[in-house]
């Protein structure tokens, strides 16, 4: 096989059918839309979710819950992630440099999944009790900001 011998698979490249350009084309007059009716009209068609008059799914299902306006999204880091990063100091700046978070506005929470084998100094927004104990056990410092 050579680059100059590459060909498209037969049938994969078909020309778009041009409709409404005269009877001789075979796709003139109604231009494949049929006669009359909502879908034959300009701008015709049904709205998304319309089920032909049957009560649509979004109205059959109950309204549940709400989205809190004060919700805070935390970037979750586990002890195993800190081990993988291999940094001595974990804070917003070091995580931005490692491309874990995008900016200082990100909130960070550390959880205790995995194990940690080396000393790490941590400066984060939230930390679980188990993660805090694991870091301090190895001689690291934990600062909640």
Curated annotation (Swiss-Prot):
Q: Name one Pfam family in it.
A: Ribosomal_L27A
Its domain of life?
Bacteria
Transmembrane portions of the chain:
none
User: Is this entry keyworded Membrane?
Assistant: no
Q: Where is this region: Disordered?
A: 20-54
Keyword Nucleotide-binding belongs to the record:
no
Q: Name one GO cellular component term.
A: cytosolic large ribosomal subunit
Look up the record and give one Gene Ontology term from the biological process aspect.
translation
Q: Which GO terms describe its molecular function?
A: rRNA binding; structural constituent of ribosome
Swiss-Prot/TrEMBL keywords? Ribonucleoprotein, Ribosomal protein, RNA-binding, rRNA-binding
Compositional bias of kind Gly residues: 42-52
The task this protein performs is described as: Binds to the 23S rRNA.
The record's subunit annotation is:
Part of the 50S ribosomal subunit.
- UniProt similarity note: Belongs to the universal ribosomal protein uL15 family.
From the Swiss-Prot or TrEMBL record, give the protein name. Large ribosomal subunit protein uL15
Question: Which species does this protein come from?
Answer: Mycoplasma mycoides subsp. mycoides SC (strain CCUG 32753 / NCTC 10114 / PG1)
Which lineage is the organism of this entry classified under, starting from the top rank? Bacteria, Bacillati, Mycoplasmatota, Mollicutes, Mycoplasmataceae
